[in-house]
Amino acid sequence: MHQERVNKVLDLMAQKNLTQMIISDPSAIFYLTGTWIQPGERLLALYLTQTGKHKLFVNELFPFADAIQCDKVWLNDNMDGIGVLAEYVEKDKPVAIDKNWPARFLIGLIDKKAGSTFVNGSEIVDRVRMVKDAEEIKLMREASRLNDLA
């Protein structure tokens, strides 16, 4: 996990009085974890919480996700992934959800009443990603240098 980036997300969540967020966009998960997972139709969710008990909900078909430095909840195609995720969500508090989560997952979570309300949390991750950290600046400069050579 890129802990500094996660901390920035948590800070913006706190400013909006949000204690939990579900991130499903593979590019946002890559940004926060450093591991690219393309789940296809399967559930992939990074659950961030102000308590620090972050969880990555990921299918067993992606064992390389084990390298990510956070707790994993392994799912398989025979499980009710949304039901498993709902067990971890604080049901009496709002849940921030990113803009790219398929409706079939969000509606399932709503049906399980796994949050007091649901809000669009995409602005939080988007704002953090707008400001590049030193590592990103270095990588962008190197990419530009290589592009200039081509």
List where the protein language model places each region.
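A composition/biophysics-driven feature that prefers long, compositionally simple stretches
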Residues: M1-L149
